[in-house]
């Protein structure tokens, strides 16, 4: 039964390729990067004086704290990738998973289409996974990451979302809504595994939900810390939820390398009104983006120091 479901994933992949062939994706990415760059440069030139004032709010402790919690979030992501390869029939150690995730994640900054995917699949196959299993594992990881980011964002922002829809945000209403969201999340996690041709046991579903929630907390704190520095007075839960939605839609935006621009725009929208200016919030999100890059490079360095050597030395 599992094998009969696997072609559905191939059909979905073919549909995406038909709608966004590699050349189209590359063109869209190039256009998007140019647009974002022009917007950022124009915005900075026009608002340089006030931007420099905001930058003074970010102490070394704020920057270091942002990098630290982001690295922890990325460690959790590598643990989650360990679960996904296990679902696809191959168990890796934490050191192996941390290295493969960090090395391939850094490649997302290289211009082009699918370097991140190609790097991960190559690393998996070098470690003994078949090409088919490696491709399925990476596809399932991306699906679960998008799903988990959107789910944790919706759960964190349930009260705000209900109020925006004109629905009561009473405790009972919020609780019932969150239960329904969790139920949908469980079903979609299970469905994702089945579409790759692999059965996903209840323990794997529960572990995925826990790990996705933990990574959402730490990655979201990477936004909350800079927001606190500019006196935005945003609660940690709102920052976590807003950034989770931004991450989810950023992952899904095939035209935006590393979700750049999309992640920030969605996060800004989801945060809503604050006690500071919109400009200060935008600068805080920009600081998060830069510190995320620093965290990516640092994670790569850490993973390189602990990665297993070919001769088996530790």
Regions found by a protein language model. Give the residues of each.
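Residue-level signal for inorganic ion chemistry
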Residues: 84, 112, 134, 140, ...
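Membrane-interface alpha-helices at helix entry/exit sites of multi-pass transporters
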Residues: 94-99, 116-118, 125-142, 276-287
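Transmembrane alpha-helical cores of Major Facilitator Superfamily
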Residues: 106, 140-143, 248, 290
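Predominantly cytoplasmic-facing regulatory/coupling regions of multi-pass membrane proteins
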Residues: 1-102, 149-253, 262, 273-314
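Transmembrane helix boundary and interhelical junction motifs in multipass membrane proteins
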Residues: 76-79, 110-121, 250-267
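Mid-bilayer segments of alpha-helical transmembrane spans in multi-pass integral membrane proteins
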Residues: 105-114, 142-150
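Conserved N-terminal subdomain of the carbohydrate kinase-like
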Residues: 104-105, 121
């Amino acid at each position: 039964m599992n094998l009969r479901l696997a072609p559905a994933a191939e059909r979905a992949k073919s549909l995406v390729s038909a709608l966004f062939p590699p050349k189209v994706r590359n063109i869209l990415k190039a256009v998007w990067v140019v647009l974002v760059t022009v917007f950022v440069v124009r915005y900075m030139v026009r608002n340089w004086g006030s931007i420099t004032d905001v930058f003074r709010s970010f102490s070394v402790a704020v920057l270091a704290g942002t990098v630290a919690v982001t690295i922890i979030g990325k460690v959790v992501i590598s643990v989650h990738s360990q679960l996904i390869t296990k679902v696809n029939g191959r168990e890796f150690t934490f050191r192996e998973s941390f290295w493969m995730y960090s090395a391939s994640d850094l490649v997302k900054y290289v211009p082009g289409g699918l370097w991140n995917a190609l790097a991960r699949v190559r690393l998996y196959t070098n470690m003994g996974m078949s090409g088919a299993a490696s491709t399925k594992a990476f596809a399932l990881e991306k699906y679960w990451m998008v799903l988990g980011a959107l789910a944790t964002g919706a759960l964190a922002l349930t009260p705000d979302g209900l109020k925006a829809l004109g629905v009561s945000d009473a405790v009972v209403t919020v609780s019932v809504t969150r239960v329904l969201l969790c139920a949908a999340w469980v079903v979609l996690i299970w469905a994702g595994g089945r579409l790759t041709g692999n059965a996903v046991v209840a323990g794997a579903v529960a572990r995925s939900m826990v790990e996705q929630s933990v990574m959402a907390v730490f990655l979201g704190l990477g936004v909350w810390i800079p927001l606190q520095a500019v006196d935005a007075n945003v609660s940690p839960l709102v920052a976590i939820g807003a950034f989770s939605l931004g991450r989810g839609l950023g992952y899904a935006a095939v035209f935006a390398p590393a979700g750049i621009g999309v992640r920030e725009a969605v996060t800004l929208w989801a945060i809503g009104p604050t006690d500071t200016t919109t400009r200060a919030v935008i600068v805080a999100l920009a600081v998060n983006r830069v510190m995320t890059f620093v965290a990516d490079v640092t994670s790569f360095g850490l993973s390189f120091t602990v990665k297993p050597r070919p001769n088996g030395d530790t």
